[in-house]
Amino acid sequence: MTAQILDGKATAAAIKSDLTARVAALKEKGVTPGLGTILVGDDPGSQKYVAGKHRDCAQVGIASIQRELPATATQEEIEAAVRELNEDPACTGYIVQLPLPKGIDENRILELMDPDKDADGLHPMNLGRLVLNEPAPLPCTPNGVLTLLRRYGVEIKGAEVVVVGRGVTIGRPMPLLLTRRSENATVTQCHTGTRDLSSHLKRADIIVAAAGSAHLIRPEDVKPGAAVLDVGVSRSAEGKIVGDVHPGVAEVAGWISPNPGGVGPMTRAQLLVNVVEAAERSVG
C-alpha cells in the first residue's frame, strides 16, 4: 500500500480562490480586510515566513500592514506597536511573529492584542473561548489539519485520534477541536514523555504528529490505512529540516500529509480565513 497524499498546497489554493470572492464582496461594501504583522529583529526564518504571509494577502486582495522593529526594541516599543494595530481600523487581523528577542515578555505582548483581531487564534481569551465552545478565531494549524482531512473525505466522526505533542500552537488546541460535537472524535494526547507511545499509535485511525522529534512516528507504529499528518519540524544532524514521521510510513498509511507541502500551506491559508472572517463580522 502506498498512502494517498493529503495535498496541502492544492487545498490551500482552493481556499484562496474562495477567499478572493469573499474579499471582493467585502470591498463592494466598502471594507477591505487587512493583515498586520509585527516582526521584531532580523531572523531570516521569521522574515521569510512573514514575507510569505504578505504574498498570500496580495493573491486574495487583502491589504498588508507591516510593522518591523529592530532586535533591540524594548518591551514598551513592542507593546506600542500592538496598541497601534489594535486601534487601526484598516487592520482586521494581525499576528506578532514569534519568537520575540530574549528578555521580552511574550505572554504580556499576546495578552495585549485585541482578541477580535487575533489572526493566529492563540490569544488567551480565544483559547478560553475554544474550551467553552464559544465562537472565536480558531488556531490556524489545528484548523488547517481538520480542513485537510475533510477535503479528502477522511472520516473524523467516531475516529480514534492520537495527537502527539503538547505545544500551545498545535498539541494543546488540537484535541479541543477534535472533540467538539461537530467532529466527535475520540482523542488520546501523547507526547515525548509518553510510556509505550507505539501502543497508542497502533490503535489510531488518525495520527497528528506535532512533537518536533525527528522521525518519531515509525512504520511499525502505524495501523495500515491510517491517516497520518506530519506537523513536526526539527533538524537532522546534517542540519536538514525533517518531520516527525519516518518516510517509510507512506508504505503503511492510507493517507499522509507531506512535510513540507502538507499542513504548512494550510496554516497560512487559515490565517487568511481568520482575517477575512473578522472583516465579515465587522459588517454584520
From Swiss-Prot:
Cross-referenced InterPro entries: Aminoacid_DH-like_N_sf (IPR046346), NAD(P)-bd_dom_sf (IPR036291), THF_DH/CycHdrlase (IPR000672), THF_DH/CycHdrlase_cat_dom (IPR020630), THF_DH/CycHdrlase_NAD-bd_dom (IPR020631)
Gene Ontology cellular component list: cytosol
Metabolic or biological pathway, per its Swiss-Prot or TrEMBL entry: One-carbon metabolism; tetrahydrofolate interconversion
Catalysis performed (reactions): (6R)-5,10-methylene-5,6,7,8-tetrahydrofolate + NADP(+) = (6R)-5,10-methenyltetrahydrofolate + NADPH; (6R)-5,10-methenyltetrahydrofolate + H2O = (6R)-10-formyltetrahydrofolate + H(+)
GO terms, biological process: L-histidine biosynthetic process; methionine biosynthetic process; purine nucleotide biosynthetic process; tetrahydrofolate interconversion
Domain of life: Bacteria
Molecular-function GO term, any one: methylenetetrahydrofolate dehydrogenase (NADP+) activity
Binding locations of NADP(+): G165, R166, G167, T192, V233
Listed EC numbers: 1.5.1.5, 3.5.4.9
SUPFAM superfamilies: Aminoacid dehydrogenase-like, N-terminal domain, NAD(P)-binding Rossmann-fold domains
Alphabetic keyword roster: Amino-acid biosynthesis, Histidine biosynthesis, Hydrolase, Methionine biosynthesis, Multifunctional enzyme, NADP, One-carbon metabolism, Oxidoreductase, Purine biosynthesis
Self-association and partners: Homodimer.
Record family assignment: Belongs to the tetrahydrofolate dehydrogenase/cyclohydrolase family.
Job of this protein: Catalyzes the oxidation of 5,10-methylenetetrahydrofolate to 5,10-methenyltetrahydrofolate and then the hydrolysis of 5,10-methenyltetrahydrofolate to 10-formyltetrahydrofolate.
Name of the protein in question: Bifunctional protein FolD 2
Organism, as annotated: Streptomyces avermitilis (strain ATCC 31267 / DSM 46492 / JCM 5070 / NBRC 14893 / NCIMB 12804 / NRRL 8165 / MA-4680)
Source species taxonomy: Bacteria, Bacillati, Actinomycetota, Actinomycetes, Kitasatosporales
